[in-house]
Curated annotation (Swiss-Prot):
Consequence when changing R253A: Loss of RNA binding
Gene Ontology BP annotations: maturation of SSU-rRNA; ribosomal small subunit biogenesis; rRNA processing
The protein's role, per its UniProt record: Required for the early cleavages at sites A0, A1 and A2 during 18S ribosomal pre-RNA processing.
Protein source organism: Saccharomyces cerevisiae (strain ATCC 204508 / S288c) (Baker's yeast)
UniProt protein name: U3 small nucleolar ribonucleoprotein protein IMP4
Main location class: nucleus
Length: 290
């Protein structure tokens, strides 16, 4: 069993490396194509690459849609997307406060097929191993600082990725006036202003936490709105009336900011870092990554 998992992991990493290499090559060819169309000089590293320019003329027959498909290197969800519903476990750090436990309950209600697990004395490798054996697709771990939720980690099984978000301005359901009852039907999802490749990667991670398929009778809406790399999460219910549509917020309400994306699972500290927020760079606060 362990040998098979190790072999599958090696095969997956090799396939992922090949796809990333092809994606980088395709991006370089796209830069050459744009430079030729606009009459701009090529960057020095591309101008000196003779093999890249030699093969460029054979790429002119590629359609834009095919080029876009070549850049889609994220196949972690391909095996189960739209075929089976996600199975999610929500847990916390050790010895959680009352407020963090309450927030974990509300996050559990946010996802239709989620189960909340008391952390107890579980160490992370044993917890991940138990999730894999039980057929869990995603693990959500919440952390806090002095009773205030500070981070949310999403790890997909069996091979990753693992996305870590910082939490800001957390408002729980019981802090919202007239929040109403929590609906547990499959929600409609709204993803707003995710324009970059990294943004679409984050959308792929978040949307696969929910069930696929039509939701005609659902009156529940969850919104993920990107504003300056801060993802605002809001949950509403709506009711159709004679005068139109009335909406009400049911919570919880918080902002997330991505600060690290790894290719492996949560217990794998040696996994490759796909993206990491580097605040010490001068342009870190001026550039939008999502």
């Amino acid at each position: 069993m362990l040998r098979r998992q190790a072999r599958e992991r090696r095969e997956y990493l090799y396939r992922k490396a090949q796809e990333l290499q092809d994606s980088q090559l395709q991006q370089k060819r796209q830069i050459i194509k744009q430079a030729l169309a606009q009459g701009k000089p090529l960057p020095k590293e591309l101008a000196e690459d003779e093999s890249l320019q030699k093969d460029f003329r054979y790429d002119q027959s590629l359609k834009e849609s095919e080029e876009a498909d070549d850049l889609q290197v994220d196949d972690e969800y391909a095996a189960t997307s739209g075929i089976m519903d996600p199975r999610i476990i929500v847990t916390t750090s050790r010895d959680p406060s009352t407020r963090l436990s309450q927030f974990a309950k509300e996050i559990k209600l946010l996802f239709p097929n989620a189960v909340r697990l008391n952390r107890g004395n579980y160490v992370m490798p044993n917890l991940v191993d138990a999730c894999k054996k039980s057929g869990t697709t995603d693990l959500v771990v919440l952390h806090e600082h002095r009773g205030v939720p500070t981070s949310l980690t999403i790890s997909h099984f069996p091979h990753g990725p693992t996305a870590q978000f910082s939490l800001h301005n957390v408002v729980m359901r019981h802090d919202i006036i007239n929040a109403g009852n929590q609906s547990e039907v499959n929600p409609h999802l709204i993803f707003d202003n995710f324009t970059t490749a990294l943004g679409k990667r984050v959308v792929c991670i978040l949307k696969h936490l929910f069930n696929a398929g039509p939701k005609k009778d659902s009156e529940r809406v969850i919104t993920f709105a990107n504003r300056g790399d801060f993802i605002s999460v809001r949950q509403h219910v709506y009711v159709r009336t004679r005068e139109g549509v009335e909406i009400a917020e049911v919570g919880p309400r918080f902002e997330m900011r991505l600060f690290e994306l790894r290719l492996g699972t949560l217990e794998n500290k040696d996994a490759d870092v796909e993206w990491q927020l580097r605040r010490f760079i001068r342009t870190a606060n001026k550039k939008d990554y999502l």
